Amino acid sequence: MELDVFAGQEKSELSMIEVARAILETRGRDKEMYFNDLVNEIQNYLEKSDADIRSSLPFFYSDLNTDGSFIPLGDNKWGLRSWYAIDEIDEEVITLEDIDENAPKRKNKKVNAFMDGDEDAIDYNDDDPEDENFTPSSAILEYDNDNEDDENAEVESYDSELNEIIPDDDLDDVELSEEDDDDDDDYEDETND
């Protein structure tokens, strides 16, 4: 078998993936090949031994999967992606309709690197089962139900505690007067300069 694409090139310099592409292109559209047949054709063209092909087979298969120009067609058949229109390619597509909105959502499990598989250790990052039922509406505190008498009692007890620290009689004796402060004058002098 001769491939016109590689005329004038040494076969030892060609990669298996290049030869596979050329073989499939010469066969034409809708002439996909089984993987084993493709490898045999490549081996015959490159004139490589069985041992050489076996050693490079994993790399070739990886290249075949990652190269964007090849497409697996099922049953270990391979073809060129250019042979098929986008509409013909049967790939799994997840749409919003496929997602069940009522399905229970799974929580991501946090991994604690410091636990070391100790089953007796307490994982404080574990969620409390009561937290799962927590809703913001249950957290709203109602202040309207407070008793005004309780509030007045609190204010009176606070006032009595303050009176213990400073009696009301002493507050009347304190005179507030404005002192002359030299620092204020110094500040005014600095700002006027």
Curated annotation (Swiss-Prot):
Coiled coil: none annotated. GO terms for cellular component: DNA-directed RNA polymerase complex. Residues 14-83 form the HTH HARE-type domain. GO terms for molecular function: DNA-directed RNA polymerase activity. Residues 119-133, 143-193 have a biased composition (Acidic residues). Keywords: DNA-directed RNA polymerase, Nucleotidyltransferase, Transcription, Transferase. One of its GO terms (biological process) is regulation of DNA-templated transcription. PROSITE patterns: HTH_HARE (PS51913). Residues 119-193 are annotated as: Disordered. Pfam families: HARE-HTH (PF05066). RNAP is composed of a core of 2 alpha, a beta and a beta' subunits. The core is associated with a delta subunit and one of several sigma factors. Belongs to the RpoE family. Participates in both the initiation and recycling phases of transcription. In the presence of the delta subunit, RNAP displays an increased specificity of transcription, a decreased affinity for nucleic acids, and an increased efficiency of RNA synthesis because of enhanced recycling. HAMAP family: RNApol_bact_RpoE (MF_00357). This is Probable DNA-directed RNA polymerase subunit delta. It comes from Streptococcus thermophilus (strain ATCC BAA-250 / LMG 18311). The gene is rpoE.
